[in-house]
Amino acid sequence: MNWVLVFIAGLLEVVWASSLKHADSLLDWIIIFILIAVSFILLIRSYQKIPMAAAYTVFVGIGTVGTYLTGIVLGESFSAAQMFFLALLLAGILGMKLFTKESKSQPGGEK
């Protein structure tokens, strides 16, 4: 369940980061602020069972890969070298997810 929170937080990061370029009204900025807040709340909640470094790395990686791919869909240029390094980043994200165990401890450090 906690990895689901990280995944949703990462997807929200893609949405708000991609929206920054197109925001041109107060309502747009309010929505972006809400998306930022919700994404970080979900990320922080995931820290209850997932090591902070792993959760944050996966969160940022999802945001990076997703935002980059969104840029490509919206017509931004890309190269074979960029795609290679994006694939390496994706492999690192998957590795962090696969080799990180969730903690059994409760919030506050009690076991």
Curated annotation (Swiss-Prot):
Keyword Membrane among record annotations: yes
Lineage: superkingdom: Bacteria
Residue stretches spanning the membrane: 3-23, 24-44, 54-74, 80-100
GO biological process: transmembrane transport
One Pfam match: Multi_Drug_Res
Keywords: Cell membrane, Membrane, Transmembrane, Transmembrane helix, Transport
GO cellular component, one term: plasma membrane
Similarity comment text for this entry: Belongs to the drug/metabolite transporter (DMT) superfamily. Small multidrug resistance (SMR) (TC 2.A.7.1) family.
Alphabetical list of PANTHER family matching this protein: GUANIDINIUM EXPORTER, SMR FAMILY PROTON-DEPENDENT DRUG EFFLUX TRANSPORTER SUGE
Full protein name: Uncharacterized membrane protein YvdS
Protein species of origin: Bacillus subtilis (strain 168)
Lineage: Bacteria, Bacillati, Bacillota, Bacilli, Bacillales
Gene for this chain: yvdS
